[in-house]
Amino acid sequence: MFEEMMGTKPVSERQKFDVDALDGYLRAHIPDYPGGPLTVAQFKGGQSNPTFKISAGEQHYVLRTKPGPAAKLLPSAHAIDREFRVMDALHKAGFPAARQYTLCLDESVIGRAFYVMEFVEGRVLWDQSLPGMSAPERAAIYDELNRVIAQLHTVDYAAIGLADFGKPGNYFARQIERWTRQYQASATETIEAMDQLMAWLPKAIPPGDDTAIVHGDFRLDNMIFHPTEPRILAVLDWELSTLGHPAADFSYHCMSWHIPPGQFRGIAGLNLEEMGIPSQEAYIAAYCERTGKTIRIEDFNFYLAYNMFRLAGIMQGIMKRYVDGTASSAQALENGKAARPMAELGWTYAQRAISLLKDKQ
């Protein structure tokens, strides 16, 4: 699975760019850059911003760009400058994010905006059941995930220069409105569950507010682990990051406990205790202990419904790019088809929230 998703391939015709121009730019902007000949290979995984492994001699880097010139971009998508900014600030603050080298917003250099960061050697773990590991190894991996998301949500974002990285407060209302707009802009068919969620979610937001840096896609396969230790070296894919409610980010991360192994490699229905994987209740308790935050269990169905709505919106965006011919991965159609079942699962959790509310009345 690792080779299938994170191996490299020759750069596709649609994503080709002037390698010599890139080499010249890097010579001028990266200290100790060894210079060409520069070789470029495209990573197979990822649908949004094309990502490349670039090598100059024995030195390796990661190049991330906006999609090629033919791409039709949603208004707020592909903001690579934000990815660069948040990773740069977090890396300098001691959080496990890749070191950033240079950001170029001048599209005349290679035909699109791009940034370059370090290439981090390590493991990407795709299956959340962690096959082939012992129970203690699984427990250590999950504890490290919990530690790192708790670390992220307790970073003083203002102190590291990210006070204006998003709008503090009212996060759920703004995000529901945003993903409603983006879903409607990318719809290719009618999904009744999405219509129901778009109507219900704005009226069901739990009371209370909090603000932290939120990753937006904090899941196992967006981590690079140390080759042999249960230690996260770098958190990847910051394209959805902003200032937001940490409960939204954490509950998204907890969706694995509610998705069966056949869908997005979830862990619902597995014998977690035997496997060494914590229960959701224990995982939430560990997060709350590390952060000092409180998550009300009665609000969790809303959080799950919201995140499944949001994920369905992301999947629908991938489907739209597939239909338009601008998706940058062969996985696009498979992922796009997941929009409907994800929305339907989200509506199931919304109905649970509605039922619990009725029981309390």
Predicted ranges, named:
Residues A248-G292, Y306-G325:
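Active-site activation/catalytic loop segments of kinase-like enzymes and analogous catalytic loops
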Residues I213-H215, L220:
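Catalytic-loop of the protein kinase fold
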Residues M1-P34:
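Juxta-kinase regulatory segment immediately upstream of eukaryotic protein kinase catalytic domains
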Residues K293-D299, R310-Q361:
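Helical subdomain adjoining the active site within ATP-dependent kinase catalytic cores
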Residues P37-I213, H226-P230:
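ATP-binding pocket architecture of kinase catalytic cores
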Residues G166-K167, I295-Y306:
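All-alpha amphipathic helical-bundle segments outside canonical DNA-binding/catalytic cores
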Residues L236-S241:
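Activation of the activation-loop gatekeeper triad in protein kinase-fold domains
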